C-alpha cells in the first residue's frame, strides 16, 4: 500500500493580528502501513496531530470529536479542525474540497488490488 501525502493551504482562526488572507501550508498524510485507520495533519513547525480517518470524514458532515481533535463543517465550502494540546488550542480552517480529495486518495491507497 502506498503513502498518501497532500499539501494544502489553511487559515489559522485567531483573534490575534493575523491577516485574514494569510494562509499557512499544511501537510495531510496517510500511511496505511503504519495505521490504516489514522491520518496526520502537520502544521508549520513541530505541530502534528494523528487522529482517526473516520473522525475527519464524519466531521465534514456534522460536528465530530470530543477529545484532542474536533472537526466540523463551516458553511457550505469550509471545514474547521480544532486541535487541543497542553500548550493550548489551534483552530484551523480548510477548504472542504481539499479534505475530501485527501480522503478519497486515502481510500484509493488502502483499496485491495484485484488481479
Locate each region found by the language model.
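Positively charged, low-complexity terminal tracts
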Residues: 1-115
Amino acid at each position: 500500500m502506498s503513502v498518501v501525502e497532500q499539501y494544502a493551504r489553511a487559515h489559522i482562526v485567531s483573534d490575534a493580528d493575523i491577516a485574514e488572507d494569510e494562509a499557512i501550508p499544511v501537510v495531510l498524510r496517510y500511511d496505511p502501513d503504519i495505521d490504516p485507520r489514522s491520518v496526520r495533519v502537520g502544521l508549520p513547525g513541530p505541530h502534528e496531530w494523528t487522529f482517526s480517518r473516520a473522525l475527519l470524514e464524519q466531521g465534514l458532515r456534522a460536528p465530530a470529536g470530543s477529545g484532542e481533535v474536533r472537526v466540523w463543517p463551516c458553511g457550505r465550502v469550509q471545514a474547521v479542525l480544532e486541535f487541543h494540546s497542553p500548550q493550548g488550542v489551534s483552530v484551523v480552517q480548510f477548504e472542504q474540497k481539499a479534505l475530501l480529495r485527501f480522503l478519497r486518495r486515502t481510500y484509493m491507497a488502502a483499496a485491495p488490488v484485484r488481479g
